[in-house]
Amino acid sequence: KRPDGQGITLVNIGVGPSNAKTATDHIAVSRPHAWPMVGHCAGLRASQSLGDFCLAHAYLREDHVLDDDLPVWVPIPALAEIQIALERAVDQVTQLQGYDLKRVMRTGTVATIDNRNWELRDQSGPVQRLSQSRAIAVDMESATIAANGFRFRVPYGTLLCVSDKPLHGELK
C-alpha cells in the first residue's frame, strides 16, 4: 500500500465461475474502485495468434452461477473508462498503436462457460452459440466477474491473452 492507504490488490480467484462468484461476492463489501479481470482464454478466431490480447466489449454468460441473482437476459455493458485504461496498458507494454495495436488486440464478446472440457464434447451446440454471439474468446470467469460488478456497481473490465485455440487445433 501507498502511504495514503491506496493501492492495488491482486486476487487469484482460481479457476471457474463458482470461484469468481464467491470471491467477488466477498470482495464487493469492501467497495473496490474497479475489478479488472486479467487472465488467459481460448481464442476463437482464425486471425488470432497465441499471445494476442482480447479486450471484452460484451459478455456471453454460460456460467450458470448468477442466473438467480441476475438473469442472463440482462445486458452487461462494457465500461468506456475501463476499456480505455486496459487498451492504454496494452499500448504501453507493446509500444504499438493504431493498426499495429489492433493486429495483436481484438475487441469483442468474451464467452464464459462452466464446462472446462466444452471443446471435447459434441461441439454443435456450444460452437453454434459462440458463432452467433460473435465471441472472440472463451474463458471460465470474465462474464461472472463482469456480471457481479454490474450487480454490485463495481466498475469492471476484461483483458485476456490467447493461450490456446481449441477450434483450430492450437493448444497450450
Q: Which residue stretches match the model-derived regions?
A:
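Zn-dependent metallopeptidase/amidohydrolase metal-coordination segment
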Residues: A143-K172
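Metabolite-binding pocket within alpha/beta catalytic cores that recognizes anionic/polar moieties
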Residues: K1-A85
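Gly/Ser/Thr-rich active-site loops/lids in small-molecule metabolic enzymes
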Residues: H57-Y59, L130-A135
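Active-site rim beta-loop-alpha module in soluble metabolic enzymes
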Residues: W73-Q132
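Short acidic/His/Gly/Ser-rich catalytic and metal-binding motifs that mark active-site loops
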Residues: E62-V65, W118-R121, P166-E170
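Short acidic/polar active-site loop segments enriched in Thr and Asp
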Residues: H33-A34, I136, P155
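Short glycine/serine/threonine-rich phosphate/pyrophosphate-binding segments
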Residues: S18-K21, M140-I145
